[in-house]
Amino acid sequence: MANSSYFISPTKGQMSPAAVVADIKDYLHQDPQAFYRLVIGSDSQERRIDGVKEANYVTAVVVHRVGHGGRYYWRNGTRQVVHSLREKIYKETQLSLETASSLVPVIRKSLNGSHNWELEIHIDVG
């Protein structure tokens, strides 16, 4: 299964990456004086199918208005055979970095430096 091209929002349902960026921008505009953390991370769940160990990957994008809640979006990633813990951690990291490299420049451009936020790539090691 290829990495999904859309995200899921618990409140808005299926969203394109462009819609996620627009929603993040709108959320930050609601309280421009607040401080925000944009956290992008991936995780996986292993299972065995016919004796073959496989992992299903999920990537989340979280916008945390520090002290006041937040929003999140997620998407299913790839399924692949897992040979080692190292390989699984590398894949999780790769998915997070790919998501950040596609979304963050667009978010920065759409905000035009108008908001106080920081980026965090969450890597779950182990």
Question: Which residues fall in each region the model found?
Answer:
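Acidic, metal-ligating active-site segments
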Residues: 40-41, 47-74
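Short helix-terminating capping/connector loops at secondary-structure junctions
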Residues: 32-34, 110-117
